[in-house]
A protein has these predicted regions:
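Small-residue-enriched hydrophobic alpha-helices in membranes
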Residues: 1-164
Length: 164
């Protein structure tokens, strides 16, 4: 099992950013002002409240503690650079970041720990998608997870190496 001490500061920041990146990808895939606040809350709840994954409990637990500490200290979390970029470019950059995290986990972690961490990231993406309702009018005809969000989650899963 790996711990925070096994990672450089840059690597650790990549790991901290990964669940946020996955959540933002889902939110951007089918962005609606009315659902964005719920999805942001869902992303935070997904990071902090979902069960710790088997095999990666220590690593994810340490990461959650860092996220909580930054939040309590009102430290600004890194945001993807979106200035002057079209949404497709931003999404491609985010997938690249998640691919880098997947490679880092595969390189440094035992397989069960890497898989557990990746599944936790997917759990954050799923919780984000399920937190808002998409489409419809005043909630009528809306769906919990849109097709665009499902497509984004599929790309995330493939990039993390969880599905082909």
């Amino acid at each position: 099992m790996t711990t925070k001490a096994d990672y450089t500061e840059e690597e650790w920041n990549e790991l901290v950013q990964a669940p946020i990146t996955a959540g933002l990808m889902v939110m951007m895939s089918d962005a609606h002002v009315t659902s964005m606040m719920g999805e942001m809350k869902g992303m935070m709840n997904g990071m902090i409240n979902q069960p710790l994954p088997e095999g990666a409990q220590e690593l994810v637990g340490s990461l959650i503690e860092d996220i909580k500490a930054k939040s309590e200290n009102k430290e600004k979390m890194e945001q993807p650079d979106m200035k002057g970029k079209d949404p497709e470019t931003v999404m491609a950059d985010m997938l690249g970041q998640l691919g880098s995290v997947a490679s880092l986990l595969d390189e440094k972690c035992p397989e069960d720990e890497a898989t557990g961490f990746k599944q936790w990231i997917m759990g954050v993406a799923e919780t984000t998608a399920e937190a808002g309702r998409e489409g419809g009018f005043l909630g009528i005809g809306s769906v919990r997870v849109s097709d665009k969000e499902k497509a984004a989650m599929q790309k995330i899963s493939q990039t993390l190496g969880l599905t082909e």
